[in-house]
């Protein structure tokens, strides 16, 4: 694998994601009617036996819980692909309530840092036509912390927002199947820069979240409501997000630290 430039990292991710297979089948429970040892001729046979003997419970159908499971699987897959890059790429995994889910660097990208965040969205199913939108707006960023103050190193981040050469989202779009233990049908992975799928609306009425466009084809084509990244950042950094007491205290602390840090450090 040779040097990967910023646009090519996005294409590299797209290529890898084409080969991702959603193979989560349920939650294993020890209790069941199996007479051990169990013998299976292939994976599908094993799955069927575990299901028939009561060992396979359904994954959660609640969107946030299911998304967490799917995100872990996708990050694991990408980490395996990065590990197979022959040292061209390296990666660090984020934690819970952390941005990004995956930080990519390495000699293949000139030692620069790239933020790769995983988003999961359910298709909005209607009786009249095939799905054309997500059930709700994907959250691109938390608008009142690291995004609004990109030179500060906020808790829950590897480094300041502005230190990244590029921000990329891997978006998993699926149809919920309530009748299977895996819960997921027709998973599609889309890789886009967040600003290219940005809308002018929040993704929550109660939280300070920046929302994406709803249209599935708009997500695929990177057809958001902003013509340029500069327009996206200008609009959302001027947005009147609420800043609660906890966030305000943290902001004041970070600003004080920045003032005390000598230039060049």
Q: Where does each model-flagged region fall?
A:
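A generic, well-ordered mixed alpha/beta core segment in the N-terminal half of proteins
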Residues: 102-103, 116-119
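Nucleic-acid endonuclease domains
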Residues: 1-98, 107-111, 120-265
């Amino acid at each position: 694998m040779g040097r990967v430039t910023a646009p090519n990292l996005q294409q590299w991710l797209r290529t890898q994601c084409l080969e991702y297979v959603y193979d989560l089948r349920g939650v294993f429970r020890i209790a069941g009617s199996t007479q051990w040892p169990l013998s299976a001729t292939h994976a599908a046979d094993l799955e069927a036996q575990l299901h028939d003997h009561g060992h396979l419970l359904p994954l959660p159908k609640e969107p946030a819980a299911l998304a967490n499971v799917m995100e872990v699987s996708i990050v694991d897959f990408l980490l395996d692909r990065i590990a197979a890059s022959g040292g061209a790429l390296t990666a660090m995994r984020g934690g819970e309530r952390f941005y990004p889910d995956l930080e990519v660097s390495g000699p293949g990208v000139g030692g620069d840092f790239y933020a790769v965040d995983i988003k999961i969205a359910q298709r909005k199913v209607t009786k009249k036509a095939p799905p054309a939108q997500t059930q709700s707006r994907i959250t691109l960023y938390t608008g009142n912390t690291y995004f609004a103050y990109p030179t500060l190193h906020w808790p829950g981040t590897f480094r300041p927002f502005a230190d990244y050469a590029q921000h990329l989202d891997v978006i998993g779009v699926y149809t919920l199947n309530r009748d299977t233990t895996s819960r997921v049908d027709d998973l599609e992975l889309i890789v886009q820069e967040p600003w290219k799928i940005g809308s002018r609306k929040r993704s929550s009425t109660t939280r300070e979240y920046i929302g994406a466009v709803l249209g599935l084809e708009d997500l695929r084509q990177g057809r958001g409501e902003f013509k340029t990244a500069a327009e996206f950042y200008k609009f959302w950094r001027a947005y009147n997000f609420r800043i609660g007491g906890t966030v305000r205290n943290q902001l004041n602390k970070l600003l004080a630290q920045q003032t005390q840090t000598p230039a060049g450090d």
